[in-house]
């Protein structure tokens, strides 16, 4: 199964969600940076979801926006 990134923005909460899969109850949460929350697979420890709090403020003040994670992006084929 392909793991595609989806991006959602909650204007009211000012949160950017980056998802590999839907959020589920068994995931572990960890703050990996200044108000950046990672939701981890409980078995593998891999990041499955990110929540970037106060996104519009960050985007306006910090460019480029950097996340404290390694990324291996590939085209879905």
Where are these regions (language model features)?
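A residue-level detector for well-ordered beta-strand positions
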Residues: 7, 38-39
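Short, acidic, Ser/Thr-enriched surface-loop or helix-capping motifs
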Residues: 10-11, 41-42
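Short, aliphatic-rich beta-strand segments
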Residues: 15-20
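C-terminal structural segments of small proteins and small subunits
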Residues: 54-77
């Amino acid at each position: 199964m392909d793991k595609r990134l989806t991006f959602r923005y909650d204007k009211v909460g000012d949160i950017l969600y980056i998802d590999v899969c839907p959020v589920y109850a068994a995931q572990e949460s960890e703050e990996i940076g200044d108000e950046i929350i990672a939701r981890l697979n409980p078995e593998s420890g891999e990041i499955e979801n990110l929540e970037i709090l106060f996104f519009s403020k960050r985007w306006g003040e910090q460019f480029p926006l950097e996340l404290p994670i390694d990324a291996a992006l590939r085209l879905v084929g």
